């Protein structure tokens, strides 16, 4: 996986540079998400390895209908370098660079039960205060947490779940 990220990094940076230059962050995000989802399908991944599939056909297969010329050229460069399989990693790197440029922290809040909008607003305000950036929250529900929530911002994980607290208590009692 780390090798894929290393190989994808220059393409993620290039996509970001093109989008920044054109002021088209959102369309590039949408296009990369589409292409990454298609390329991530095992059947499509196998098809991309087929030498009978031409580069133009591969680009057509992976490009969203609304793709602009810059994006099609970008896919062509990936096809020329035989790096179309890296699209999921390229999309992830692009989103990371975009969030940095827009001063946004992406956080995933996983809780034992669905959270109210008021609770999410409170968490968003606390994270904004801590990181000094706007917060984009994605939610998930995992009943195995028993109670509480786990907040993952990529670099920082805050485990306030009952499951996590019990695990820490068990660890401290064992030692």
Curated annotation (Swiss-Prot):
Q: Which UniProt keywords apply?
A: ATP synthesis, Cell inner membrane, Cell membrane, CF(1), Hydrogen ion transport, Ion transport, Membrane, Transport
Give any Pfam family that matches: OSCP
The record's GO molecular-function terms, alphabetically, read: proton-transporting ATP synthase activity, rotational mechanism
- Give the SUPFAM superfamilies listed for this entry: N-terminal domain of the delta subunit of the F1F0-ATP synthase (SSF47928)
Q: How does it sit in the membrane?
A: Peripheral membrane protein
Name where it mostly resides.
membrane
Could you state one GO cellular component term attached to this entry?
plasma membrane
Its annotated compartments are:
Cell inner membrane
Extract the InterPro entries matched here: ATP_synth_OSCP/delta_N_sf, ATPase_OSCP/dsu
UniProt xrefs under NCBIfam families: ATP_synt_delta (TIGR01145), PRK05758.2-2 (NF004402)
- Family statement drawn from the similarity comment of this UniProt entry: Belongs to the ATPase delta chain family.
Cited function = F(1)F(0) ATP synthase produces ATP from ADP in the presence of a proton or sodium gradient. F-type ATPases consist of two structural domains, F(1) containing the extramembraneous catalytic core and F(0) containing the membrane proton channel, linked together by a central stalk and a peripheral stalk. During catalysis, ATP synthesis in the catalytic domain of F(1) is coupled via a rotary mechanism of the central stalk subunits to proton translocation.
On assembly, the entry states: F-type ATPases have 2 components, F(1) - the catalytic core - and F(0) - the membrane proton channel. F(1) has five subunits: alpha(3), beta(3), gamma(1), delta(1), epsilon(1). F(0) has three main subunits: a(1), b(2) and c(10-14). The alpha and beta chains form an alternating ring which encloses part of the gamma chain. F(1) is attached to F(0) by a central stalk formed by the gamma and epsilon chains, while a peripheral stalk is formed by the delta and b chains.
Name recorded for this polypeptide: ATP synthase subunit delta
Q: Which organism is it from?
A: Xanthomonas oryzae pv. oryzae (strain KACC10331 / KXO85)
The top of its lineage is:
Bacteria, Pseudomonadati, Pseudomonadota, Gammaproteobacteria, Lysobacterales
